[in-house]
């Protein structure tokens, strides 16, 4: 059904040409969604324990506790890896870097991020941007965020302006709020680098 708009004038209203094409194929082609953009979401959480190193976004943060994990336990990078892998439908971090493998024991999560970047390139995707949030009661992360952005951007081969990192507390409510855990959530946008 063709929709018409009416022109308001002092005279009698007259029909305007429809902005909608008459051919259904032409109309549908204007709204065809190509798989050129993909969105992924990732999250990670680690219990904190005394005597462990706290590393977030590839940055060592002085603190008396750190994550209990097979690798370095960088929850921020783990969430970003999952978001990127999910956007490209390439599985998850556990599939690519299993905690049952000695190869990844105490490994730097920046290595994971570089490998994920390579996988994305092989699959025909480029990273448009990453947006992440870290939940940690203390220490305050604001002073470390610019360094995190630079390290993450370097590992991903993008500009720091394409990486957003935010920090939140748990307001004393859950395991994060009680200072017992660190949590990270991330969203990533990919673009197809080839048709």
Give the positions of each predicted feature.
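Pyridoxal 5′-phosphate
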Residues: 165-169
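Short active-site-adjacent structural elements
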Residues: 142-143, 172-176
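Generic structural marker for isolated residues within well-ordered, non-membrane alpha-helices
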Residues: 149
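RNase III-family endoribonuclease catalytic core
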Residues: 34-146, 155-156
């Amino acid at each position: 059904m063709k929709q018409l708009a009416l022109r308001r004038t002092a005279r009698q209203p007259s029909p305007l040409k429809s902005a909608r094409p008459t051919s259904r194929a032409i109309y549908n082609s204007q709204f065809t969604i190509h798989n050129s953009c993909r969105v992924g979401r990732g999250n990670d959480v680690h219990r904190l324990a005394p005597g462990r190193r706290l590393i977030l976004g590839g940055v060592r943060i002085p603190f008396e506790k750190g994550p209990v994990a097979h690798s370095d336990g960088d929850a921020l990078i783990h969430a970003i890896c999952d978001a990127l892998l999910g956007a490209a439908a390439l599985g998850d971090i556990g599939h690519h870097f299993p905690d049952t493998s000695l190869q990844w024991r105490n490994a730097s999560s920046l290595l994971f991020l570089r490998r994920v970047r390579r996988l994305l390139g092989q699959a025909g995707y480029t990273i448009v941007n990453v947006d992440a949030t870290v939940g940690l009661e203390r220490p305050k992360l604001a002073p470390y965020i610019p360094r995190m952005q630079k390290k993450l951007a370097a590992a991903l081969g993008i500009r720091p302006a394409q990486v957003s990192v935010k920090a939140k507390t748990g307001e004393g409510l859950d395991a994060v709020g009680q200072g017992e855990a660190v949590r990270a959530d991330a969203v990533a946008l990919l673009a197809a680098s080839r048709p």
